[in-house]
């Protein structure tokens, strides 16, 4: 469950290490984002020679949450922390590699590229 001011680690190779959510997209009253939701983020910690710089604003998709996601069969998939993948304006991933597992809930038309790049899909 991600809300405004939440800090997330970055699960790709764009050079960003940590981002902060500044807006949950999808309606003016929408407060929380879960796995598969698009949020607006700002880069808080970046690698020295990365593709992105500190202070820049991007779209991102949430790929892991500590809150987890409930499946239809009743199982619950949780992670140790919150993570996101940075996206460009067309909602395509900026990075070329994804680190760590992602969930099957991302297997939609919009985020198939992220699922195919991920080393493990839970």
Swiss-Prot record:
Q: Which GO terms describe its cellular component?
A: cytosolic large ribosomal subunit
UniProt-listed CDD domains: Ribosomal_uL14 (cd00337)
Q: Name one GO molecular function term.
A: structural constituent of ribosome
Quote the protein name from its UniProt record: Large ribosomal subunit protein uL14
Query: Which one Pfam family would you cite for this protein?
Result: Ribosomal_L14
The cysteines covalently paired via disulfide bonds are none
Keywords per UniProt: Ribonucleoprotein, Ribosomal protein, RNA-binding, rRNA-binding
Kindly indicate whether the keyword Ribonucleoprotein belongs to this entry. yes
Recorded hits in PROSITE patterns, A to Z, give: RIBOSOMAL_L14
Family the entry assigns? Belongs to the universal ribosomal protein uL14 family.
> Which SMART domains has this protein been placed in?
Ribosomal_L14
Q: How does it assemble?
A: Part of the 50S ribosomal subunit. Forms a cluster with proteins L3 and L19. In the 70S ribosome, L14 and L19 interact and together make contacts with the 16S rRNA in bridges B5 and B8.
Functionally, this protein is described as follows: Binds to 23S rRNA. Forms part of two intersubunit bridges in the 70S ribosome.
Q: Which GO terms describe its biological process?
A: translation
């Amino acid at each position: 469950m991600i809300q405004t001011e939440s800090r997330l680690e970055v699960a790709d190779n764009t050079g960003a290490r940590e981002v902060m959510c500044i807006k949950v997209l999808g309606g003016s009253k929408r407060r929380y984002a879960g796995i598969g939701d698009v949020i607006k983020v700002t880069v808080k910690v970046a690698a020295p020679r990365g593709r992105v710089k500190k202070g820049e604003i991007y779209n991102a998709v949430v790929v892991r949450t500590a809150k987890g996601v409930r499946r239809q069969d009743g199982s619950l998939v949780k992670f140790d922390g919150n993570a996101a993948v940075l996206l460009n304006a067309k909602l395509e991933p900026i990075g070329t590699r994804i680190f760590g597992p992602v969930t099957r809930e991302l297997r939609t038309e919009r985020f198939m590229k992220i699922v195919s790049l991920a080393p493990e899909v839970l």
